[in-house]
Each structure stands twice: as structure tokens, then as C-alpha cells.
UniProtKB/Swiss-Prot annotation:
Catalytic activity: thymidine + phosphate = 2-deoxy-alpha-D-ribose 1-phosphate + thymine
Binding-site residues, substrate: H116, R202, S217, K221
Identification of the protein by name: Thymidine phosphorylase
Species of the source: Homo sapiens (Human)
Assembly: Homodimer.
SMART domains: PYNP_C
A single Gene Ontology CC term: cytosol
Gene: TYMP
Length: 482
């Protein structure tokens, strides 16, 4: 059975072995550790922290001896002064070793893969990619998160399916991987506790955008899974953390480099997030669209991203000779129904009534909609003029849906799972004035004037001829010698 390993009891086998030679869990930070004020001063003044310094700081965070002000000061010093690759690698490793580790059967060593996204609007890739990879022979122990702010959370989307349970123990995760080949679960407090503390502190100290801290947060949570390979979807654009491709590339290179230094093969895909991914935004609506993609249909941009990311993972983990061959295998899993079959198994294994799981995975789009939460009202917006759709801005659309109850402003806030929006047009399509271009699903009264204006301003029209919408995929950053 899968087990949680406490610090000091050993580490998962390679390639998930990131403990370092002679290291078992989080070691004593130093025979004579520096005091926290001295560490903060060093980094504030642009100094380089040693391994003992970083491990001492992480140990103080976990054992409670670091005060909140000291944690915030260190985070700001790192944000302003940065960290080199070795410092970032040590921080990542120390965070990962601050809690318990997942351990899997030796036979699974090369099968374990996962994906992470920096967050976007309409991003339902994980719902499709995990079962597609399982259908290709992988094991996918996906530990995911909830939405906060304008981006949606994978766990929230799955919880729009009645009965789906995201709380699973390590032992239950192994059963799920045996039965379905994949699982999508929430973060356990036993795993990477130091990251949980630092993440909360970053959120209130304006240090969320620090590259070393982002890298350590992402990779520490993946290292404990004992993966063979990881792909990270680094988004850029108007609704992403990074406004442009250059900044996203900097994070991508850091993720790949730190992963390589810790024995984890990481690829990072740079993808555009100016418009929503696919045509649907909102929890239940995105589940419907994910099912459509697993029918072998659905929006081309969603399918393209699923096959691109999946192809990279199959290549990195040795399940395909090239990225293109891997992408073709993922596409075949979408077209032949095997990905949908794995999704049905995952639903049933994670608490969904088997009859409901079967109905969702075998029903028509109209039948599926009857089985998932639905908003009480629908409201369509009309094109204000003739023109070609240049862009549908994702950020204002997401912010209005957030106001309507599709998002949360604080942890634990309830969601309206049926609230969302459907794009009725594609980028590059010619529109006539008065044609419906957006359908809003709402529980409350009609859209307010400011909400309607914000949505209409999200639609960008031009006079140019119709054109084929570009793929959101821009670039793939690979590990050395790959």
C-alpha cells in the first residue's frame, strides 16, 4: 500500500528520491545555526544563503519558532534580492522534506507523472489529461487545488459532480491508482506543511510573484509524489500571473533547472491566457466541456493543449519516442473512448454513484447537463456591431462571473457551481450586429449595468477578414539533454 513517510524514515525511490546523499528527511539545520535576524539581514543585503541557512529557516517556520514578521521579512528579502539556482533547489528540497512523503510500489517508478498549471480562465485541462494519461499506461497521483480570485480550481470543478470526494488518504490514493490509473485529490496537511505556511504568508505580503518562491512552492508539492516526470503549464497574458511570454519563460527555465538538479524531469509549456481556454467558464460547465473533449470532440484549443502537454509527459517518462508520438497517443485515447473510460472509473472510485458516473460518461451533452448543477437563469449578450472576433478577454469575463458567485474571495466561501458562461463564438469568426455571442448562466437577477458593460468590453472586434484561431501553445522548455 502507498504510505506516508515521516522525515527521518527514508525517502521515496529514484526518480522521486530527492533527499540527497546521506540525507534522510529534514536534517538538523546546523550545529550552530544562525539566528533568524542574521539570515534575514544577509538576504536583505544581497547575500547568498547556505544550505544550512535555508534549512534552518524552513525548520523554524515548521516548528513555530519563526515569528510571522520574520517570515514576512525573509519572503520580502527573497522577493527583492532573488535566489540563485542552488539556493532555490535547496529551498525546494527543504520544503518537500518538511512533512511526510508519498511512497509507491517499485513497479510504478517510471509510470508516475503529473501536471501543474499556474492558473487560468476556463482551464479544465487536468480533468481531461489525467484520465488520458492513465489510458496511455501512466499513474497520475494529481494533488490539485481550489480556486481563489479570478481563476478556477480543479477540485471545485470536480465537486460539481455529486458525490465526488477529493479527500483521500495515501492508502486510498494507491487504491485509486490501481483501479483507475489516476486520481485528483486535495492537499493533505501532512504533506509539505512548510509550503502551506509560506504560501499563506506570501498571499498577504505581496511576494506571490517571486520566481524562487513560486518554483519552490510548485516543485516541493510534486517532489513528494515520487514522480518520473512533470509538465508545468506556465501561462502568460492578460488573465495570467505573467503578462508576457518573456517573464513566463524565466519561470519555465527556473522550474526545469531546479527540477533537473533534484532528479526530476520537468518540462514547461508556455501557453497564452488572454482568452478563456475552450468555450466554457464555470465549474459544472467546464466539466461538461471536459467530457466533450473526452468524446473526441470539443474546442480545438482545449484538445491541442491536452495533447501537447500529454505528449511531453509521455516522452519525458519514456512512454513515447518523441513528443509528437506521445501527443498522437493522447489524441487516440480521446478518440477511442479509453480516456473517458478511465474518467468514469475515477469518478466511481472517488465516491460518485456508479450509475451517475456511467450516465455522465455515456450520455449526450443535453443529458449530462441535467445531471450537473444548473444555474436558474440564462442571459445572452448580443454583438454591438459587425466585425471579426479578435479576442474575448478572459479577465473581465472571469471577474464578472466571480461577482455572480462562481469564485471565492476567501478560503472556504461557498460557490455557485452552476454559474458560468458559454462563448457562442470563436476567435477569428465573423459576427453580425445583434448576433448572440455570450450566454451567461446566473442564479441571481439580471446582469447589472456595470457587469453588462464589462462583458461587452471583453469582446474585441476588428474589420479584418475571418481567420483561424491560433493555438494557445507557444513554446516548450525541456530539461538538459532531452
Amino acid at each position: 500500500m502507498a504510505a506516508l513517510m515521516t522525515p527521518g524514515t527514508g525517502a521515496p525511490p529514484a526518480p522521486g528520491d530527492f533527499s540527497g546523499e546521506g540525507s534522510q528527511g529534514l536534517p538538523d539545520p546546523s550545529p550552530e545555526p544562525k539566528q533568524l535576524p542574521e539570515l534575514i539581514r544577509m538576504k536583505r543585503d544581497g547575500g547568498r544563503l547556505s544550505e544550512a541557512d535555508i534549512r534552518g529557516f524552513v525548520a523554524a517556520v515548521v516548528n513555530g519558532s519563526a515569528q510571522g514578521a520574520q517570515i514576512g521579512a525573509m519572503l520580502m528579502a527573497i522577493r527583492l534580492r532573488g535566489m540563485d539556482l542552488e539556493e532555490t533547489s535547496v529551498l525546494t528540497q527543504a520544503l518537500a522534506q518538511s512533512g511526510q512523503q508519498l511512497e509507491w510500489p517499485e513497479a510504478w517508478r517510471q509510470q508516475l507523472v503529473d501536471k501543474h498549471s499556474t492558473g487560468g480562465v476556463g482551464d479544465k485541462v487536468s480533468l481531461v489529461l489525467a484520465p488520458a494519461l492513465a489510458a496511455c499506461g501512466c499513474k497520475v497521483p494529481m494533488i490539485s487545488g481550489r480556486g481563489l480570485g479570478h481563476t478556477g480550481g480543479t477540485l471545485d470543478k470536480l465537486e460539481s459532480i455529486p458525490g465526488f470526494n477529493v479527500i483521500q488518504s495515501p492508502e486510498q490514493m494507491q487504491v485509486l491508482l490501481d483501479q483507475a490509473g489516476c486520481c485528483i485529490v486535495g492537499q493533505s496537511e501532512q504533506l509539505v506543511p512548510a509550503d502551506g505556511i509560506l504560501y499563506a504568508a506570501r498571499d498577504v505580503t505581496a511576494t506571490v510573484d517571486s520566481l524562487p518562491l513560486i518554483t519552490a512552492s510548485i516543485l516541493s508539492k510534486k517532489l513528494v509524489e515520487g514522480l518520473s516526470a512533470l509538465v508545468v503549464d506556465v501561462k502568460f497574458g492578460g488573465a495570467a500571473v505573467f503578462p508576457n511570454q518573456e517573464q513566463a519563460r524565466e519561470l519555465a527555465k527556473t522550474l526545469v533547472g531546479v527540477g533537473a538538479s533534484l532528479g526530476l524531469r520537468v518540462a514547461a509549456a508556455l501557453t497564452a491566457m488572454d482568452k478563456p481556454l475552450g468555450r466554457c467558464v464555470g465549474h459544472a460547465l467546464e466539466v461538461e466541456e471536459a467530457l466533450l473533449c473526452m468524446d473526441g470532440a470539443g474546442p480545438p484549443d482545449l484538445r491541442d493543449l491536452v495533447t501537447t502537454l500529454g505528449g511531453a509527459l509521455l516522452w519525458l517518462s519514456g512512454h513515447a519516442g518523441t513528443q509528437a508520438q506521445g501527443a498522437a497517443r493522447v489524441a487516440a485515447a480521446l478518440d477511442d473512448g479509453s480516456a473517458l473510460g478511465r474518467f468514469e472509473r475515477m469518478l466511481a472510485a472517488q465516491g460518485v454513484d456508479p450509475g451517475l458516473a456511467r450516465a455522465l460518461c455515456s450520455g449526450s451533452p443535453a443529458e449530462r447537463r441535467q445531471l450537473l448543477p444548473r444555474a436558474r437563469e440564462q442571459e445572452e449578450l448580443l454583438a454591438p456591431a459587425d466585425g471579426t472576433v479578435e479576442l474575448v478577454r478572459a479577465l473581465p469575463l472571469a471577474l464578472v462571473l466571480h461577482e455572480l458567485g462562481a469564485g471565492r474571495s476567501r478560503a472556504g466561501e461557498p460557490l455557485r457551481l452552476g454559474v458560468g458562461a458559454e462563448l457562442l463564438v470563436d476567435v477569428g469568426q465573423r459576427l453580425r450586429r445583434g448576433t448572440p455571442w455570450l450566454r451567461v448562466h446566473r442564479d441571481g437577477p439580471a446582469l447589472s449595468g456595470p457587469q453588462s458593460r464589462a462583458l461587452q468590453e471583453a469582446l474585441v472586434l476588428s474589420d479584418r477578414a475571418p481567420f483561424a484561431a491560433p493555438s494557445p501553445f507557444a513554446e516548450l522548455v525541456l530539461p538538459p539533454q532531452q
